[in-house]
Amino acid sequence: MFLGEKMAGDAFLKSIESNFQNAVRCLNATYENDQLGEDLATKIMVANSTYVVRFGVRLRGQLFTFTGYRSVHSEHFEPVKGGIRFAPDVNQDEVEALAALMSYKCALVEVPFGGSKGGLIIDPREWSEPELERITRRFTQELAKRDLIHPSQNVPAPDVGTGEREMAWMADEYKRLNPAELNAWACVTGKPVSKGGISGRTEATGRGVEYALRAFFDHPRDVAKTGLTPGLKGKRVIVQGLGNVGYHAALFLSTEDAALVTHVLERDGTIVDETGIDIAALRTHIMENGGVTGFPGHVASGMEMLEAEADILIPAAMELVITEDNAPNIRTPLIIEAANGPVSAEADVILRERGIVIIPDLYANAGGVTVSYFEWIKNLSRIRFGRLQRRAEEARFNALIDGIESMLGKSFPHDIAARAVDGGTEIDLVRSGLEDTMRNSYEVISKVWNDEKMASDLRTAAMMVAVRRIAQSYQTLGI
């Protein structure tokens, strides 16, 4: 691990802790008769445990040693939940910061999990698929020895460098190690649908970003603070990172909300098109060519394009991309954090002083863990969502339409009738549940932001809600 990578993880952890400490100060100033003591605050802030595992895998005629991490931040609810990332710059501070963020995120959107996070120091691009599978299965064995993967104790999910494939390997290895475990497939989420996954999980975080923006723009008082006009239609959007989250957020905003994605930043440059980028075509180009070079509108400029003029900035890649160095130059009145921790604590202060509104990560990217919760429930219940009620709903709506047609002596247009009687499929129910979660959560955050003097911004408001809920949970446990 390079020194710079360790320092970046340390800065990220300090940003999370700074946000927490600010929330505690604001809570104690707001609720004078319900103080959060320093002892309990410290208990909530620090990670309960962090495990470092080192294991060997014999590949290519030699023994390679790999280092992995799994941090458990808070067990006020179990199981604890959080992704596993495969990246060469994974470090303990980063993993602990992400685990803490998971605790606050779950509390904010009322998902009954504690926070956890894991990582493996590896560059997946350096290994073949069979080699990566062997490494992943060995890592799973090490986690399973310590109950760091378990359907009722610790449930991993995809993150940077991992996806459905890796989750299927991990679940299968856990099942092999625990053949009598009835709920074995609930040991991870983000699996392929064919292996107990849920429809809509892949798009969930990006879809949640879309729903978060819709919720924000449905609150005129909040929108007025940005100086933007109501509605997403025609809003110019910059997206940094077209991975899974950035791609789905950009795709849905452009195709369903008529927003204009004018800039997409990637490792090998930026695509610029003021009339709106074809996100699906760009994604195909990246998959076929390994980058954005050669796509219409390509310019060699990189991170400085975060400072381009637009209405909404969506950092959707890694943490700490907006720092005190570039924060003074950001020109979008609204930032929504699709990535975890993309804005440093120092940059956050600068942006707020400049009047820029930030929709924080612990709310904005909670779509992933929300739908992971739905998947976990599906695995425990062992039944697909909608299987019991879909046809009954269709029968009721058909009877209603038949009655109306009989009374009026007229027939419904076929397309309207078909939409009205169609029972909800699993993905319909998942999207409905996710939208309900994001809208209800924003209502709570917005109320605190607008009603409480100490909640000067959305991040502080969201952290106040999350920390208070965790504290109340601990207090009811007698801690």
Language-model segments: residues:
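Glycine-rich phosphate/diphosphate-binding loop of Rossmann-like nucleotide-binding domains
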Residues: 196-309
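Conserved active-site and cofactor/substrate-binding residues in soluble primary-metabolism enzymes
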Residues: 11, 15-18, 35, 90-93, ...
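Adenosine-phosphate binding glycine-rich loop
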Residues: 3-10, 34, 216-217, 329, ...
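Rossmann-like adenosine-cofactor binding region
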Residues: 269-358, 363
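Glycine/serine-rich phosphate-binding loop and adjoining beta1-alpha1 elements at the start
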Residues: 87, 107-233
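Glycine-rich, N-terminal phosphate-binding loop and its surrounding beta-alpha-beta segment
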Residues: 42, 49-124
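Short, Gly/Pro- and small/polar-rich lid/capping loops
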Residues: 6-54
